[in-house]
Amino acid sequence: MGSVQRQDLVLFSDQSVLPAHFFQDSNSHNLFFITHQSCTQPLWMINALVETHVLGSPSSLNESSSSMLPSSTRSHAVLASFIHEQNYFTNSLNKLKIPSNNYNVLDFLSDFIVNNIHNKPRDKILSDVLAKFSAAIQNNPTDTIVIIEQPELLLSLVSGLTCSELNNKFITPLLRQCKVLIIVSNSDIFNIDEYDASVHSSNLQNFYKSSFIKSMINLNLNPLKTGFAKDVTGSLHVCRGGAPIATSNTSLHVVENEYLYLNEKESTKLFYR
C-alpha cells in the first residue's frame, strides 16, 4: 500500500462525516448502523465519529481536515457498550485529546446483570437502561450523538425479550432523544455454517434487519476474503440504509463507496478499493 494514495473518509454528499444539518434541524433524528465481525474491531470508526462530532473533523483519520467546526456547535457524545468497560473508550479518546467533558461513557458490562436484570421484569429493565441514557443526554439534547455497542446482547441477557420489544421500548425511544444514534453490532451470526433456527437466532437476525431498515446509512467492516495481509486490515463498505435522511437539506445523500483500511498502532489509513 506504500504507493497507493491515502484517502479521506467521506460519508455524505456535502463531503462530511457528520453533516451539520443533522444538528440544525429540530426534528432531525438519524440512525447509523455499523456492522463488523470479531476480527474487524470497530473502535477506530467509533473514535472517528466522536472526534468528528466534538472537534469538527476526524483529523486522526483524514489528512485533509480543512473544514473543522467549532467544538461548541456540536459538543456532546454518549457512548455505551455491553462488551467493553469504560476504560476501553476513555483511554482511546484521551489519546485523541477529546475533552472529557464532551462525552459520557455508560458501562453496561460491569455488574450489569446483578444491578440491572436480576429479578426484574423486561419492561422495567428496558426503562431503567433507557433512563441512564436520558440522564446523560438531558443537558445537551440538540447537540448529542449516542453510540451504543451491541445492544442486541440484551436479547440474550433478558429472558424472553423479543426484537419488537427491544426496538419499541428502547431503540426507538432512544433515537427520539438524540440527534444521531449509532448502533454498532457484531454480524458473526451470519457466518455460522449451519443455520440456527432457534428463537434466539431469529430474534438476532430480525434485530439486524430492522436496524438496517431504520438506518439511513450502513457501514460494514469486513475482513479480507483472501485472509491476512500486512498492508490491509479489512474493507469498509458504505451504503444507504433503508430509511431516508431526516433533514431539510433535500439534496444531501449518502456517498456509497468501498475503502480498504489499515489499522496501525496509533492510526488508521483508508484507501479506495
Swiss-Prot record:
Protein name stated in the entry: Elongator complex protein 6
UniProt record similarity statement: Belongs to the ELP6 family.
InterPro entries xref list: ELP6 (IPR018627), P-loop_NTPase (IPR027417)
The protein's annotated pathway: tRNA modification; 5-methoxycarbonylmethyl-2-thiouridine-tRNA biosynthesis
Subcellular location(s) per record: Cytoplasm; Nucleus
One cellular-component annotation, GO: cytoplasm
Task performed by this protein: Component of the elongator complex which is required for multiple tRNA modifications, including mcm5U (5-methoxycarbonylmethyl uridine), mcm5s2U (5-methoxycarbonylmethyl-2-thiouridine), and ncm5U (5-carbamoylmethyl uridine). The elongator complex catalyzes formation of carboxymethyluridine in the wobble base at position 34 in tRNAs. It functions as a gamma-toxin target (TOT); disruption of the complex confers resistance to Kluyveromyces lactis toxin zymocin (pGKL1 killer toxin). May also be involved in sensitivity to Pichia inositovora toxin.
Subunit structure: Component of the elongator complex which consists of ELP1/IKI3, ELP2, ELP3, ELP4, ELP5/IKI1 and ELP6. The elongator complex is composed of two copies of the Elp123 subcomplex (composed of ELP1/IKI3, ELP2 and ELP3) and two copies of the Elp456 subcomplex (composed of ELP4, ELP5/IKI1 and ELP6). The Elp123 subcomplex forms a two-lobed scaffold, which binds the Elp456 subcomplex asymmetrically. In each lobe, ELP2 is tightly sandwiched between ELP1/IKI3 and ELP3. The Elp123 subcomplex binds tRNA through ELP1/IKI3 and ELP3 and can bind 2 tRNAs simultaneously.
Natural source organism: Saccharomyces cerevisiae (strain ATCC 204508 / S288c) (Baker's yeast)
Keyword terms: Cytoplasm, Nucleus, tRNA processing
Gene Ontology MF annotations: identical protein binding
GO biological process, one term: protein urmylation
